[in-house]
């Protein structure tokens, strides 16, 4: 059998073993599809499950990636696809039902971990030219696939594509350096960008470091000369450039859509490059423990005992030259600097705040560790004297690492002694089995048993680590998911059967409710294919978020609008005709003929406006001065052509109860009107808002709304009070808040800023000082005024119009000085024509489309064209042509050189 085929078969078997055993974990530990647990936790549960349901609809033609009104008010989801959904593993969605998506998620994790084992095996076999024994290759490949990162980040399924492509990229770097070939490097970089540009960026940054590292190793071994290395540097840059070109079909539109409008760089980013060290290197050793998780200043590279013993032996072995130790030491130090020095950590996180998932690039460090172990094992035991020395060496490494790990745990004052001692025991046991293996190489039976025990121990410890991490990261809601999907699908189908017009649907409850009525699953409109006003992703358009914020739906971290209530005039303007709610909402009318499902009834907004109507004027863009109530009044006044007072302020008496509590007493509420409140805050206080003894909601913190409805009895006084940091049990925790510098400068004096104690993320401020800045806005909504203005605008509904994903058409009569309002966002990419002529549209609220009309009949057409998509296609094609051309030229050069050497 040819050598390449043997390597492929062995890699395939390794991949199958890893994937099948991962699925066996699911069966053993009751994960979907065999139980009610799932790896789809955290953001996977909140966002990604709905994304996969949406992708399934796109695959079957029921929705669109190109442009979809199911995503927020409407946007292109090419950037979302490029980041979350582009993996080829997602093609499995074609063969499952939406009720089985949690099962798909777990199976997809297993497939990607199998691929990681396979590509790692291919790398190790090829890079070491068969010098690394098969048993080491298998164990180290499995260690890479089942490393801590794989299960810690399993919920971020899209990042696992980077895990299995990294070995191919780094093997491509080696090919480029040693043989001057670029095909694998360019192709793997291009594929990585296409599958997930984020991990592709991380892997490419690491590949730069790896190029220097490999070049130094090859120079030290005398395999290449310095002049060759310099020439190969230009070849490497050329190859990486071709790889980027290949990925341009998705990467270029993503750059425009994601970075150009979504607010990809979030709040607090001014601090990303502060010169600051997070921690010391002891934490990296302490983090090499079974079940350990990465956190700020503590990275976990755990991938079993075999890898760490081999890496330690690499540094302490007499066979490792001083130069090679220096090269590997500098590479390791560079990596840890990227973990613990804030500016470098920010670069490797691609300039994203990593608060939620620290060390997203930890898989690169684990690969470095495994590589160093492979270097050692590839050279170990080559002579009888080596076997004697190696046996003692692995014992020293195992025992030494175990006790150093214990020392680091005590230095860092970690209390999880059970996992600490278990990790130590496994490392020592592994070193003893390796010792027996090297000491008894002549006694085949003993050496075979010793290595078999090493194999069993490696599989067992990695399996146990997987079990612990999976348990810590799991979701336990997989059993409830199918029932919710069926009921939600049926409810949306009921609404569409009840009303087949053009409208949006909102909801105040989703699949899971957090504490006190907050929720984060804002992508259900994408999953169940209806038009809404909400979505949650890193690819939201910033202009959309700002508009929604102005009309009362708060912008949360530039990734979602908090839509967990109904602001009647705002919903009416957006064409939200139906609201799915667990409880009655003042002003909405329950539709008794539609069945209550998932604890939600269907309510109709009687004030909902049509999606297209004519108004007098050319654009309505009032200035926003921080008050959503007055801004909504101004919008309606502009559309109606006369002053409209929907909201009127109501006097409220504020009382400071203590350092952490403020209350407001609202008096003289106009009879028959709906009361709303808003308590603008300068910085989060993670509070609990008590609304007139009727309900509570988290407020002034993560996922909390801005505007809120206040139920009251006619003629009574309404009372609202806010408790700051309500769930803190420690007084010190409650008394001081960590405030970002951007927030702090909005209310602290220069003296306070100068005197304040700085934190890793900002400045410490007393909670009472933040509460000093709280103020209350209380407004009454006049339903009669709302009824009057909406009837006036409804009477101007466009004569004939249709709205579809990516295409809007309208025929209406008009005259000069009038405009057509469309409840469609003015995204980049819309080409708008009026009577066949391309025009520039105005806006309403600086976001919704307003088309100026002319006298007579106006035929309006809007068609969405993907910005730079065609250019991206051409660049990808150019990249493939350049790769083919360059590979042919390099092949000819190598053949000529080989023929010349043969002569």
Go through the PLM ranges and name each one.
Residues 5-78, 474-526:
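Hydrophobic alpha-helical membrane-insertion signals
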Residues 21-117, 142-163, 202, 258-263, ...:
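Membrane-interface coil-to-helix junctions
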Residues 42, 46-57, 88, 232-235, ...:
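Periplasmic/ER-lumenal interhelical loops and adjacent helix-loop junctions
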Residues 176, 199, 326-337, 341-346, ...:
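Contiguous transmembrane helix-bundle modules in multi-pass membrane proteins
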């Amino acid at each position: 059998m040819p050598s390449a085929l043997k390597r492929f078969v062995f890699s395939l078997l390794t991949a199958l073993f890893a994937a099948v055993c991962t699925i066996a974990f699911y069966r053993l530990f009751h994960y979907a599809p065999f139980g009610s647990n799932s790896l789809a936790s955290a953001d996977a549960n909140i966002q990604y499950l709905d994304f996969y349901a949406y992708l399934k609809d796109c695959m079957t033609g029921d929705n669109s990636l190109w442009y979809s009104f199911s995503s927020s008010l409407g946007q292109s989801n090419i950037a979302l696809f490029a980041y979350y959904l582009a993996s080829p593993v997602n093609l499995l969605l074609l063969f499952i039902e939406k009720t089985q998506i949690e099962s798909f998620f777990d199976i997809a994790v297993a497939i990607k971990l199998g691929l990681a084992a396979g590509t790692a095996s291919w790398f190790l076999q090829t890079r070491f030219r068969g010098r690394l024994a098969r048993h080491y290759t298998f164990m180290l490949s499995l260690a890479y696939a089942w490393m801590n990162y794989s299960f810690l980040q399993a919920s971020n399924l899209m990042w696992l594509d980077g895990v299995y492509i990294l070995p191919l990229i780094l093997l491509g770097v080696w090919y480029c350096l040693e043989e001057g070939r670029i095909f694998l490097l360019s192709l793997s970089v291009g594929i990585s960008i296409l599958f997930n540009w984020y991990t592709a960026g991380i892997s490419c940054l690491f590949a730069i470091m790896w190029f220097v590292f490999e070049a130094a190793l090859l120079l030290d071994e005398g395999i290449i000369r310095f002049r060759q290395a310099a020439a190969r540097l230009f070849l490497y840059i050329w190859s990486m450039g071709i790889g980027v070109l290949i990925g341009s079909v998705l990467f270029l539109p993503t750059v425009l859509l994601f970075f150009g409008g979504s607010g990809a760089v979030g709040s607090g980013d001014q601090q990303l490059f502060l010169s600051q060290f997070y921690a010391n290197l002891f934490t990296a050793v302490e983090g090499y423990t079974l079940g350990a998780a990465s956190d700020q200043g503590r990275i976990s590279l755990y991938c079993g005992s075999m890898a760490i013993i081999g890496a330690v032996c690499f540094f302490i072995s007499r066979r490792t030259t001083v130069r090679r130790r220096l090269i590997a030491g500098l590479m390791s130090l560079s990596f840890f600097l990227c973990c613990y020095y804030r500016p470098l950590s920010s670069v490797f996180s691609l300039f994203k705040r990593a608060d939620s998932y620290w060390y997203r690039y930890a898989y690169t460090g684990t690969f470095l560790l495994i590589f160093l172990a492979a270097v050692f094992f590839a050279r170990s035991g080559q002579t009888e004297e080596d076997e004697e020395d190696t046996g003692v060496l692995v014992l020293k490494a195992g025992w030494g690492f175990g006790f150093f790990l214990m020392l680091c745990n005590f230095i860092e004052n970690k209390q999880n002694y059970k996992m600490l001692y278990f990790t130590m025991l496994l490392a020592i046991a592994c070193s003893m089995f390796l010792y027996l293996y090297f000491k008894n190489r002549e006694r085949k039976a003993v050496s075979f048993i010793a290595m078999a025990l090493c194999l069993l121990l490696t599989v067992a410890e990695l399996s146990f680590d997987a079990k612990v991490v999976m348990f810590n990261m799991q979701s336990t809601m997989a059993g409830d998911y199918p029932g919710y999907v069926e009921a939600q699908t049926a409810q949306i189908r009921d609404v569409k059967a009840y009303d087949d017009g053009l409208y949006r649907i909102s909801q105040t409850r989703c699949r899971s409710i957090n504490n006190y009525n907050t929720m984060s699953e804002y992508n259900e409109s994408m999953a169940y294919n209806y038009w809404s006003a909400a979505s949650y992703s890193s690819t939201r358009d910033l202009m959309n978020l700002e508009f929604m914020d102005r009309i009362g739906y708060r912008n949360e971290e530039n990734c979602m609008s908090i839509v967990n209530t109904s602001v009647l005039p705002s919903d009416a303007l957006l064409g939200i005709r139906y609201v799915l709610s667990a409880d009655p909402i003042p002003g909405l009318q329950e539709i008794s003929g539609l069945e209550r499902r998932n604890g939600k009834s269907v309510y109709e907004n009687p004030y909902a406006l049509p999606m297209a109507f004519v108004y007098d004027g050319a654009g309505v863009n009032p200035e926003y001065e921080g008050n959503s109530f007055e801004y909504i009044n101004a919008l309606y006044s502009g559309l109606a052509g006369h002053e409209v007072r929907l909201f009127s302020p109501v006097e409220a008496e504020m009382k400071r109860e203590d350092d952490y509590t403020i209350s407001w007493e609202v008096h003289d509420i106009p009879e028959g009107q709906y009361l709303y409140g808003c308590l603008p805050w300068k910085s989060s206080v993670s509070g609990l808002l008590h609304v007139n003894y009727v309900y509570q909601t988290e407020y002034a913190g993560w996922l909390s709304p801005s505007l809120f409805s206040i139920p009251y009895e006619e003629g009574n006084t309404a009372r609202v009070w806010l408790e700051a940091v309500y769930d803190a049990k420690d007084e010190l925790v409650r008394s001081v808040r960590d405030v970002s510098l951007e927030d702090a400068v909005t209310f602290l004096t220069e003296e306070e800023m100068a005197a304040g104690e700085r934190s890793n993320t900002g400045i410490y401020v007393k909670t009472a000082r933040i509460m000093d800045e709280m103020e209350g806005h209380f407004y009454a909504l006049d339903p009669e005024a709302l009824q009057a203005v909406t009837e006036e605008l409804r009477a101007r509904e466009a004569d004939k119009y249709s709205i579809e994903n990516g295409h809007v058409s309208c025929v209406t009569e008009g005259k000069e000085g009038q405009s057509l309002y469309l409840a469609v966002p003015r995204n980049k990419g819309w080409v708008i024509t009026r009577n066949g002529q391309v025009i520039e549209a105005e806006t309403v609220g600086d976001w919704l489309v307003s088309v100026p009309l002319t006298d007579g009949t106006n035929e309006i057409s809007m068609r969405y064209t993907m910005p730079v998509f065609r250019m991206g296609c051409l660049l990808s094609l150019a990249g493939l042509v350049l790769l083919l051309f360059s590979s042919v030229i390099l092949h000819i050069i190598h053949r000529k050189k080989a023929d010349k050497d043969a002569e």
